[in-house]
């Protein structure tokens, strides 16, 4: 039976994906959000889903309300619903109920969730009817699907309503210092989540924190080293992607190619292969569809503007920065790697300042954008982007959206824009600068 859903905060990456999924399943879907452009809204607009400014008038009694996790009682629509005792569900609570209708495949972990969810969704949907929800704002819904692939987020323990049949956990790392007190707190959250997985877990076997995880369901370890249950080996990394074999209990289960770059993407693919092998999916079909994966939004997204290579990536943690630069070096081994990075949240910048500096030193040159504070925090002046610049050994300087011309001081370079805030504004300024230079030279 068709329902009407109203999403409060529809531009959120998970919310927009869920909205698309429900829309494709035949439900009426609309939502509200701030006016500022966010990369997820393009997909919503293409689907014909209405995006409204926040207003009490958006809410009618016949709707089911789904509220984004960032929106609290000070939001006028949330306040209206509370005042009139109109029931609503948080995104993660709704998802926890929704997945009960499917055999569900979850992807959790500090880093690599979106890329791995995207890869698993791509392979499975090309083999059989599959619904999925990816953290880049992409969703697909099918009422007839047997399988549901989704991203499982640890922030504020949002994954606790989830009880999937299978779950990959890519890694454990200290992040979200505004919520987690330290690495032990992060591990405890993942351990609680792991206990809810019903059939099998697939965890990276070379992560010391992950190896402490205990769960009633069988745990399969994957990685590069002997001793793992699924081992990636005979690895060849080229400018066309990565080739490797996977063995399980001494038996080769397949030879695979992924058109992706960086060691982390080989691990992501190995996790997907392990999960689908245990779920009984034909490995020949898995190999076929791994070859055609085109990536997910804002994860090593490339474009060429006037012969200049630009990469856009969501990387906003030191581990992710290292992985993104590693991927850029694999694809462009003869080019200078120029990193343009915007720190995301003051709390994360303070907690990981030294780690950010070490990670950015993997690039050849570094440019920094002003820190992007989250809506949940206030800039108390405890850290400035110049503090990070001072700790970076490689050539570095701070740029503004209005003046990105220092980026032109490089020949034969790849420009890697990284961040989870509004780093794309800097990228667009650079693209405009390149376009204007070309016009002036004609």
Curated annotation (Swiss-Prot):
InterPro entries: Mur-like_cat_sf (IPR036565), Mur_ligase_C (IPR004101), Mur_ligase_C_dom_sf (IPR036615), Mur_ligase_cen (IPR013221), Mur_ligase_N (IPR000713), MurCDEF_pg_biosynth (IPR050061), UDP-N-AcMur_Ala_ligase_MurC (IPR005758). Belongs to the MurCDEF family. GO terms for molecular function: ATP binding; UDP-N-acetylmuramate-L-alanine ligase activity. It is found in: Cytoplasm. One of its GO terms (biological process) is cell division. PANTHER family: UDP-N-ACETYLMURAMATE--L-ALANINE LIGASE (PTHR43445:SF3), UDP-N-ACETYLMURAMATE--L-ALANINE LIGASE-RELATED (PTHR43445). It catalyses: UDP-N-acetyl-alpha-D-muramate + L-alanine + ATP = UDP-N-acetyl-alpha-D-muramoyl-L-alanine + ADP + phosphate + H(+). It comes from Streptococcus pyogenes serotype M18 (strain MGAS8232). Its EC number is 6.3.2.8. ATP binds at residues 109-115. SUPFAM superfamilies: MurCD N-terminal domain (SSF51984), MurD-like peptide ligases, catalytic domain (SSF53623), MurD-like peptide ligases, peptide-binding domain (SSF53244). Cell wall formation. Keywords: ATP-binding, Cell cycle, Cell division, Cell shape, Cell wall biogenesis/degradation, Cytoplasm, Ligase, Nucleotide-binding, Peptidoglycan synthesis. Pathway: Cell wall biogenesis; peptidoglycan biosynthesis. This is UDP-N-acetylmuramate--L-alanine ligase. One of its GO terms (cellular component) is cytoplasm.
């Amino acid at each position: 039976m068709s329902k009407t859903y109203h999403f409060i905060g529809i531009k959120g990456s998970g919310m927009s994906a869920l909205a698309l999924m429900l829309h494709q399943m035949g439900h009426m879907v609309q939502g509200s959000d701030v006016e500022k452009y966010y990369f997820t809204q393009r997909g919503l607009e293409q689907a014909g889903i209405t995006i409204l400014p926040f207003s009490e008038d958006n809410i009618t009694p016949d709707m089911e309300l789904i509220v984004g996790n960032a929106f609290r009682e000070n939001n006028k629509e949330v306040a209206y619903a509370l005042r009139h005792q109109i029931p609503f569900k948080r995104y993660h609570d709704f998802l926890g109920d929704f997945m009960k209708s499917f055999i569900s495949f979850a992807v959790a972990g500090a880093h690599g969730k979106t890329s791995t969810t995207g890869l698993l969704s791509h392979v499975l949907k090309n083999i059989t009817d599959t619904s999925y929800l990816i953290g880049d704002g992409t969703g697909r819904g099918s009422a007839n699907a047997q399988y549901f692939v989704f991203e499982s987020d640890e922030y504020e323990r949002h994954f606790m309503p989830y009880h999937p049949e299978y779950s990959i956990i890519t890694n454990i790392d200290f992040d979200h210092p505004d919520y987690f007190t330290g690495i032990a707190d992060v591990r405890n959250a993942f351990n609680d989540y792991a206990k809810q997985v019903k059939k099998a877990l697939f965890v990276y076997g070379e992560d010391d924190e992950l190896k402490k995880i205990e769960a009633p369901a069988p745990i399969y370890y994957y990685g590069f080293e002997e001793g793992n249950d699924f081992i990636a080996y005979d690895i060849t990394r080229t400018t066309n992607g990565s080739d490797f074999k996977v063995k399980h209990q001494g038996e080769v289960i397949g030879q695979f190619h992924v058109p992706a770059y960086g060691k982390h993407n080989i691990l992501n693919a190995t996790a997907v292969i392990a999960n689908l092998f245990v779920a009984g999916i034909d490995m020949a079909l898995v190999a076929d569809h791994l070859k055609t994966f085109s990536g997910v939004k804002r994860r090593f997204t490339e474009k060429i503007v006037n012969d200049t290579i630009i990469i856009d990536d969501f990387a906003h943690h030191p581990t992710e920065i290292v992985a993104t630069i590693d991927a850029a070096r694999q694809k462009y081994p003869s080019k200078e790697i120029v990193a343009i990075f915007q720190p995301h949240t003051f709390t994360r910048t303070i907690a990981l300042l030294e780690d950010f500096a070490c990670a950015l030193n993997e690039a050849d040159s570094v440019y920094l954008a002003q820190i992007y504070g989250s809506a949940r925090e206030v800039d108390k002046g405890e850290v400035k982007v110049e503090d990070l610049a001072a700790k970076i050994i490689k050539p570095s300087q701070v740029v503004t959206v209005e003046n990105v011309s220092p980026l032109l001081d490089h020949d034969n370079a790849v420009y890697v824009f990284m961040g989870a805030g509004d780093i794309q504004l800097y990228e667009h300024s650079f693209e405009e600068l390149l376009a204007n230079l070309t016009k002036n030279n004609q």
